[in-house]
């Protein structure tokens, strides 16, 4: 007779899925998170395909089966792509996928107009049209990769967010300042950008005017935003997965800077959310249609009563910083729980999707 533990393990095994991680590993911006996700997924017994967007394509066979074709990987998990020295185009074994058992994580798509390759998003749309669960949808990526669109969503859904105005042309700085109606210093941002890149500190109208003209000279189609500066010692990143908060860290402002990105040198700490911070973070993730997001906010002075200032939602959150922070925070409730269970936040994300009710479409239920 089988034990209860055996039955439980079999029930979990029945829910295991295939995981396709589509991403772009830029040599100037190495992608460590996709390796982390792959390793944690394989430890759970999931079948994983790590596919570089460059060179990847998908097609159906005559009998209706769909496969993903991608370049192979070396022993370190790096993609083996054709080059001037190695012109041989060698694809790995085709990877069969089906909406009923395959979860697709799309990372690094960028915006169709500014970064990435439009065909990458088009490929993800094919998967969406056929009922696959794609984390995250192309619509979610389009919103999250555009800071202005983020801001419009926040305003429409009645979130607390810093006052923000878009500068529409090279001579638009003075008009935008009048619309913003905020004191210097201000924050200037390009609508596309991540990891704190494209975010600048502005102390005068003269400096703003000069910088706006310079940016438009470099790119006549650039979207520039100015935003009121909210004084703070730190901001908060919350990982929200399918309507559930799995972790939160506070990122102190970098010494001698005004940014708090881990990539800019901030050393994160575990953050205990208030009820209003937690509920508003879940609402922000839902507002952009995200299944797995990083929600960024600046805390209110009265954290227990007032809504935080939401900055943006990230549709491809890096997990390295929060992984290391939580693993080193065994004294805190969440860190202690993860350590006792021998798990991690990435593992918890992957385990959450064992529940097919969280998948998109009837085939995933």
What does each of the following model-derived ranges do?
Residues 2-14:
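Proteolytic processing junctions in secreted/extracellular precursors
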Residues 4, 272, 286, 290, ...:
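C-terminal active-site "lid" helix and adjoining low-complexity regulatory extension at the edge
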Residues 18, 102-103, 309:
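Structural motif
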Residues 19-24, 34, 124, 129-130, ...:
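Active-site nucleotide/adenylate-binding loops and adjacent lid/helix of ATP-dependent enzymes
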Residues 26-163:
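Conserved N-proximal alpha/beta basic substrate-recognition cap immediately N-terminal to
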Residues 109-111, 191-193, 316:
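Short glycine-rich anion-binding loops that position phosphate/pyrophosphate groups of nucleotides
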Residues 186, 247, 293, 309-312:
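Protein kinase-like catalytic core scaffold
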Residues 197-284, 288:
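Phosphate-binding site of ATP-dependent enzymes
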């Amino acid at each position: 007779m089988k034990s209860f533990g055996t039955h439980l393990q079999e029930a979990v095994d029945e829910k295991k899925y295939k995981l396709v991680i589509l991403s772009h590993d830029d040599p100037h911006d190495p992608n460590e998170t996709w390796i982390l996700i792959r390793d944690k997924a394989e430890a759970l017994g999931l079948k994983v395909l790590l596919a570089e967007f460059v060179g990847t394509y998908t097609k159906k066979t005559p009998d209706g089966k769909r496969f993903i074709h991608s370049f192979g990987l070396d022993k370190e998990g790096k993609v083996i792509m054709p080059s001037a020295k190695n012109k041989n185009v060698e694809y790995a074994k085709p990877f069969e996928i089906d909406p009923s058992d395959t979860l697709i994580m799309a990372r690094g798509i960028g915006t169709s107009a500014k970064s990435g390759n439009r065909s990458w998003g088009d490929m993800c749309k094919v998967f969406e049209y056929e009922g696959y669960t794609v984390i995250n949808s192309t619509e979610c990526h389009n919103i999250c990769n555009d800071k202005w669109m983020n801001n419009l969503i926040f305003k429409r859904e009645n979130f607390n967010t810093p006052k923000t105005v878009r500068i529409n042309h090279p001579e638009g700085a003075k008009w935008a300042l009048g619309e913003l109606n905020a004191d210097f210093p201000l924050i200037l941002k390009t609508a596309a950008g991540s990891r704190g890149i494209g975010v600048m500190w502005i102390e005068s109208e003269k400096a703003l005017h000069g910088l706006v003209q310079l940016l438009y000279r470099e790119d006549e189609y650039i979207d520039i935003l100015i935003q009121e500066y909210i004084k703070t010692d730190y901001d908060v990143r919350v990982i929200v997965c399918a309507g559930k908060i799995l972790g939160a860290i506070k990122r102190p402002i970098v010494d001698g800077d005004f940014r708090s990105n881990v990539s800019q040198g901030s050393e994160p700490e575990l953050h205990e959310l208030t009820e209003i911070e937690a509920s508003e973070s879940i609402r922000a993730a839902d507002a952009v249609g995200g299944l797995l997001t990083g929600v960024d906010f600046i805390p209110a002075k009265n954290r227990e009563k007032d809504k935080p200032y939401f900055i943006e939602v990230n549709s491809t959150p890096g997990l390295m910083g929060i992984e290391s922070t939580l693993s080193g925070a065994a004294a805190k409730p969440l860190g202690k729980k993860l350590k006792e269970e021998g798990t991690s936040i990435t593992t918890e994300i992957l385990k959450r999707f064992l529940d097919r009710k969280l998948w998109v479409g009837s085939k995933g239920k």
